[in-house]
Amino acid sequence: MAKRDFYEVLGVERGASEGDLKKAYRRLAMKYHPDRNPGDKESEDKFKEANEAYEVLSDTSKRAAYDQYGHAGVDPSMGGGGAGFGGANFSDIFGDVFSDFFGGGRGGSRSGGAQRGSDLRYTLELNLEEAVRGTTVSIRVPTLVNCKPCDGSGAKKGSTPSTCPTCGGIGQVRMQQGFFAVQQTCPRCHGQGKIITDPCNSCHGEGRVEEYKTLSVKVPAGVDTGDRIRLSGEGEAGTHGGPTGDLYVVINVREHDIFQRDGKHLYCEVPISYTDAALGGELEVPTLDGRVKLKIPEGTQTGKQFRLRGKGVAPVRGGAAGDLLCRVAVETPVNLSRRQRELLEELRDSLEGDSSHSPKASGWFEGVKRFFGDL
């Protein structure tokens, strides 16, 4: 099959600049790279074709020979004096291509050996009192710890791991992708460079075993839902001598029967009787420090809010404590006796027609009258 024109392959004009060539090649390399099209023979062929075209056109002397003689000027098999593909340097192109494939620039090769253990997360349920005052709790956490019989090596006591025959102890293997070679983690030793021929009976060569660890956690006063306590070195054990991960204890404060919390402030609803609301009085309300007396002025309405300063929560990072805000809810009397009913009827009759006793209701009814009068 006759070769396509190299300019046509890259989709550029014959006078294209070096920058245009690079841009066109990079687009095709990204589109047809074998890593993005595994098992696709057509994409692999187009990838090779783009490689060949860019290798020639990006080289000044080869491009001149190609422009004058066509494929014969760069392909020895066609009688020209081309130099094959050994001299091409695509590192500047693939620095960008690999960055797009793997989400970053070309860093150092992944080496085998010690690896840090994973961090763990534990959700700790607390009641409001524990969260506000602080506490110390014991928790039991499932984790991975170093195997004691083999000291975390994975090999049976007295034996030693052998060098991986696949990668020769490097931990990586060289994979050919068309005209290019890339380094990949060795599939046999998983980047460790060594394999265990006589595994430990306790951990079966893993070097770590599952275990429940009991820990004491000191919870500072003032924590709230979502706060985290870090226990350094209490996560999963690392592999092959790597450092241990951390344990993050995440706080979740359960709902309280009386109080609702918003940051450093507490809120509660206080039911009061119809008579206390009308005549005024004094009642006891709960706080986290005990009961306090709250004075209710006469004529108190539902929704009235009273602030008890400093009766909220002291922030975990320091500062003044918040407040307790008590919202009054006036209860309508129920299950009335005959005498109680008579008294309320007498009260209603005595209040009827006097708007000074119910200014809000009077104003509302006046507004309703005006509304219907305007219709």
From Swiss-Prot:
Chief localisation class: cytoplasm
Highest rank taxon of the organism: Bacteria
CXXCXGXG motif repeat locations: 147-154, 164-171, 186-193, 200-207
Cofactor names: Zn(2+)
A GO cellular component annotation in the UniProt record: cytoplasm
PROSITE patterns tied to this protein: DNAJ_1, DNAJ_2, ZF_CR
This protein's UniProt keywords: Chaperone, Cytoplasm, DNA replication, Metal-binding, Repeat, Stress response, Zinc, Zinc-finger
CR-type ZnF: 134-212
UniProt GO BP: chaperone cofactor-dependent protein refolding; DNA replication; protein refolding; response to heat
Binding positions (Zn(2+) 1): C147, C150, C200, C203
Keyword Zinc-finger: yes
One of the record's GO molecular function terms: heat shock protein binding
Subcellular location: Cytoplasm
Domain named J: residues: 5-70
Disulfide bond residue pairs: none
Entry-linked InterPro entries: DnaJ, DnaJ_C, DnaJ_domain, DnaJ_domain_CS, HSP40/DnaJ_pept-bd, HSP_DnaJ_Cys-rich_dom, HSP_DnaJ_Cys-rich_dom_sf, J_dom_sf
Key word Cytoplasm present: yes
Cofactor annotation remark: Binds 2 Zn(2+) ions per monomer.
Binding site residues for Zn(2+) 2: C164, C167, C186, C189
Assembly: Homodimer.
Domain notes per entry: The J domain is necessary and sufficient to stimulate DnaK ATPase activity. Zinc center 1 plays an important role in the autonomous, DnaK-independent chaperone activity of DnaJ. Zinc center 2 is essential for interaction with DnaK and for DnaJ activity.
Function: Participates actively in the response to hyperosmotic and heat shock by preventing the aggregation of stress-denatured proteins and by disaggregating proteins, also in an autonomous, DnaK-independent fashion. Unfolded proteins bind initially to DnaJ; upon interaction with the DnaJ-bound protein, DnaK hydrolyzes its bound ATP, resulting in the formation of a stable complex. GrpE releases ADP from DnaK; ATP binding to DnaK triggers the release of the substrate protein, thus completing the reaction cycle.
HAMAP family, alphabetized: DnaJ
Protein family membership: Belongs to the DnaJ family.
Protein known as: Chaperone protein DnaJ
Species annotation: Pseudomonas entomophila (strain L48)
This protein's encoding gene: dnaJ
